């Protein structure tokens, strides 16, 4: 079993997939407006592509993933991050778990910012996946964008959103 299929997008042999994935992350990083003193949590860090790239920029990043070998810490709730990245994470978990995670984030630091990317899974997204030789329906996606946004907008303040090439929704939220 593969530990993290998402890292394949950042390192894909297909240059279009690689470029798309890296552009999406770069947009999210710019949206975050990171500063040297920030403590950053890469929530759902997977193989660590984002975490490693932010560390190369001299930033203080802690990665957390449900796969213990990929995490820097066992319990993400024990830190007080200024910025939290959840890139392509929430669609893989239930609505109740998304709500619980947001509640945890709010307890960790009252002034955190959340930067997230969520696939739209619209018809454009499905056709792009088909062109790339993949299934139109993504295996492992449990909660759709609409439901995730409903939770996020009820718990946090949306600061800015970007509809990236119609296939990914990128947003920055602040605690209210």
Predicted regions and their residues:
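A short helix->loop->beta-strand "cap" motif at the edges of active sites that frequently abuts
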Residues: 59, 109-112
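Short, glycine-/aromatic-enriched active-site segment of Class I SAM-dependent methyltransferases
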Residues: 119-139
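Helix-to-beta-strand junctions that scaffold the AdoMet/dcAdoMet cofactor pocket
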Residues: 93-94, 108-110
């Amino acid at each position: 079993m593969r530990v993290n299929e998402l890292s394949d997008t950042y390192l894909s042999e297909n240059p279009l997939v690689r470029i798309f994935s890296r552009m999406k992350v770069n947009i999210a990083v710019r949206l975050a407006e990171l500063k040297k003193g920030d403590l950053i949590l890469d929530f759902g860090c997977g193989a660590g592509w984002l975490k490693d790239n932010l560390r190369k920029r001299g930033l203080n990043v802690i990665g957390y993933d449900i796969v213990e070998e990929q995490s820097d810490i066992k319990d993400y709730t024990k830190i007080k991050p200024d910025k939290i990245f959840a890139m392509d994470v929430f669609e893989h978990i239930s609505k109740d778990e998304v709500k619980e995670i947001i509640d945890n984030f709010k307890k960790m630091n009252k002034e955190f910012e959340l930067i997230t990317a969520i696939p739209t899974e619209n018809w454009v997204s499905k056709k792009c996946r088909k062109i790339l030789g993949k299934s139109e329906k993504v295996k492992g996606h449990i909660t759709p964008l609409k439901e995730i946004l409903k939770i996020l907008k009820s718990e946090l303040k949306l600061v800015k959103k970007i509809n990236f090439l119609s296939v990914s929704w990128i947003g920055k939220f602040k605690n209210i």
